[in-house]
Amino acid sequence: MLPDFITVPSTSEKCLSPELLLPNMDENLEDSKPSSLKYQKAMMSRGTCPSNCKVCRHSATGYHYDVPSCNGCKTFFRRSILDGRKYTCLKMRKCLSGTEPVDLSRRMCRACRFEKCVEAGMNPSAIQADMKTTDGELLRKEIMIKQKTAVDFLNTPQVIMSFEDKVQGIIGKLTVMELKIEPLYTGGLPPGNRDIRKLDELIDAPLILSYDEIPNLKYCPSVDELTGEIKPSGACYIHCGYLASIEYSKMFDFAHKIDVASKATLIKHATIMCADIMTAFFSYYQRKSDRLIHPNGMFAGPPKYRYGEAGTKYQASMQRTLATVLRHELNRIEYMLLKAIVLCNPAVSSLSISVQQIIGKEREEYVRTLLTYCLLNYGSVHGPSRFSALLAIMSVLESQQKNAKDFHLLAKATILKDAVRYTRISNLYEQIMES
């Protein structure tokens, strides 16, 4: 079912630009008004004779009852008001629609003609004659009230948030969030330093957007014996990806409405997936690479010299998210919305019903925004399929998360079991992997 605020465009033309292609909101708003509210009394100059009758669109003979009209429509409106006549249309009330003059060789629908007189703004109080019946007086008052209501409506400031405002507002918010947390991932830790904090220290801590603000960084460099320089490492960027995802979660509205235990549960479930899609999108969008690559240029994945054949197979499987991103040519807006949907997952087990409702409400906003964006950019034909394809990426992320946890446990139980010395990525990494 489509969201309430979505209007499906009629075009099916595909547009790959991340810019929003939004319909003319003035036209949509005008079409959405009831016919009785389309009336707007025009301020007309009495110095010139109008060209066309506002009712039948034939030549006008002057201003009659404040509206440019012909003698026939003037007389019809006057007689209808004086007699208090009410008419019924048998053809969907569209007999006088269009822009061409009405065919006078055929009998004109009286109901549509009278409605057109009222919409054009003919003023019943300008009729200088006594009402013939009580019905006439009632009809005159009814028309005057309807027209006054319409004028009041048109003169009242309307505070209307269109779906354009909704979409652009949410996308703008996510863009700001991404710009804030991206340096946490792309900048990396200072060479030779490690973040030794654990998950429980991070969850309820204030938002940190710079590594200068991280307390108690531990300096423990891995030095190359030949050159004496600190060895480049991709491991710190894995930690940085997880850290950026956790800090990212603190900027959502739900973060201030749920308890610490619920935050921990949600973070344990979503951090790996958020970090994976961030790494994949960075490799594709920033590095233009068809392999997962860290910001320092090193390829992602366990080193072959230590993990052997198992590591090689796992490294190949890690590319699935990137391959999916490449196949769908994900743009930045789609990436941001998809990552927000991944994080805001109310279906995580052990969350209370009240917490699920809070998270679910926020997730619904991002799902609706993504659907709206797809419909507006890809049209009513390709939009729904694009939306479905983007959501299908979530199943790839969930599969990748399971594979990552399985490989981590396998490596600790077998490959690294008898290792004399190996460097753990971080306490945070191990806690997330083993959760």
Swiss-Prot record:
It holds the Pfam family Hormone_recep. CDD domains: NR_DBD_HNF4A (cd06960). It comes from the Eukaryota. A zinc finger (NR C4-type) spans 53-73, 89-112. GO terms for molecular function: nuclear receptor activity; RNA polymerase II cis-regulatory region sequence-specific DNA binding; zinc ion binding. GO terms for biological process: cell differentiation; regulation of transcription by RNA polymerase II; response to starvation. Residues 50-129 bind DNA. Keywords: DNA-binding, Metal-binding, Nucleus, Receptor, Transcription, Transcription regulation, Zinc, Zinc-finger. It is found in: Nucleus. The keyword Nucleus applies. SMART domains: HOLI, ZnF_C4. InterPro entries: HNF4-like_DBD, NHR-like_dom_sf, Nucl_hrmn_rcpt_lig-bd, Nuclear_hormone_rcpt_NR2, Znf_hrmn_rcpt, Znf_NHR/GATA. Residues 194-430 form the NR LBD domain. GO terms for cellular component: nucleus. The keyword Zinc-finger applies. Orphan nuclear receptor. Belongs to the nuclear hormone receptor family. This is Nuclear hormone receptor family member nhr-136. It comes from Caenorhabditis elegans. The gene is nhr-136.
